[in-house]
Amino acid sequence: MVIEKIWFHRHPLGYLLWPLLWPFSVLFGVISRSRRKAYQTGDKPSYRAPLPVVVVGNITAGGNGKTPVVVWLVETLQNLGYRPGVVSRGYGAKAPSYPLVVNEQTPAQHCGDEPKLIFQRTKAPVAVDPVRSQAVKALLEHGVNVIVTDDGLQHYALQRDIEIAVVDGVRRFGNQELIPLGPLREPVSRLDEVDFIITNGGVAKANEIAMRLQPTDAVNLKTGERCAVSKLTRLCAMAGIGHPSRFFNTLRELNADLVHCQGFADHQAFDAAQLNQLAQQGAHLIMTEKDAVKCAEFAQPNWWYLPVSAQFAPEAEQRIVDKIKEVMEPYGSPSA
């Protein structure tokens, strides 16, 4: 996409569009700062949940690897004996009504690809609502004792106890300009206020926690069969995520026999005819797990997805766990 080249690769068109886009970036900054201040001062009401809230988000537009962090966090909380629930706005989806609590039968087009993936991976209660406080209230009926929000760092209408920002360690912050001139939702200085900065790939800085996405074997969408990526011949790869090239590079690192790579927009909806035509360019079609939740109902026998999991150094993982325990302590024991 041209806009990504302008944001992250200093495309010449960016210099031509600068006079046009810069005033809108200034306006965006003024509005976002005044909006946040209104919540901080109480001029706008914010919701304080009766249980701890952990926000996982970012300061840039596009995918940074938040969802694997949310999955890791939920599984970690479950292993500690807590009962986490996840809230999301369900970006790119439209539910018949809100709040929507995700279950096995909920189609991804109603809840969103990321909430569906999180539910399938963790089996934790997941509630979707553009108004996140309403999603939290829906989860209170499901016996949860800690809330994890998928995205929502800028959703100041919901108060939080811990903020985790995920940064793309390769692309970082691009030209460091606010939307629409650059990718930033908030200035880079906003990261000085969060509890943890997790860097996905690249080289983590001194105040950041390095994360790597660890892939497993490919999984067949129809049968659930597992197979090493290197054993699948003539792969056609597709990715409808914020940074498709990251997925394709992961496949190359696994010695995949790639014959074609096709990137799509993040959260893009797919249909059977579109992907059947794409799959004809190879012997097998492989996609991200996030794409797979949208394609399962019309999947073909030669379609696969590649699960990935967030991994941290043990000491970094312990830092996050210790902070969670500290915040959770006033609310009682995990079984309370």
UniProtKB/Swiss-Prot annotation:
Gene Ontology molecular functions: ATP binding; tetraacyldisaccharide 4'-kinase activity
Swiss-Prot/TrEMBL catalytic activity: a lipid A disaccharide + ATP = a lipid IVA + ADP + H(+)
HAMAP family: LpxK
NCBIfam families, alphabetized: lpxK
Ubl conjugation found in the keyword field: no
Domain of life: Bacteria
Keywords: ATP-binding, Kinase, Lipid A biosynthesis, Lipid biosynthesis, Lipid metabolism, Nucleotide-binding, Transferase
Function in brief: Transfers the gamma-phosphate of ATP to the 4'-position of a tetraacyldisaccharide 1-phosphate intermediate (termed DS-1-P) to form tetraacyldisaccharide 1,4'-bis-phosphate (lipid IVA).
Organism classification: Bacteria, Pseudomonadati, Pseudomonadota, Gammaproteobacteria, Vibrionales
Gene Ontology BP, a term: lipopolysaccharide core region biosynthetic process
Binding-site residues for ATP, renumbered to this chain: 60-67
Entry-linked Pfam families: LpxK
Keyword Manganese: no
One GO CC term, this protein: plasma membrane
Family membership: Belongs to the LpxK family.
EC number, as in UniProt: 2.7.1.130
Name the UniProt record assigns to this protein: Tetraacyldisaccharide 4'-kinase
Recorded metabolic or biological pathway in which this protein acts: Glycolipid biosynthesis; lipid IV(A) biosynthesis; lipid IV(A) from (3R)-3-hydroxytetradecanoyl-[acyl-carrier-protein] and UDP-N-acetyl-alpha-D-glucosamine: step 6/6
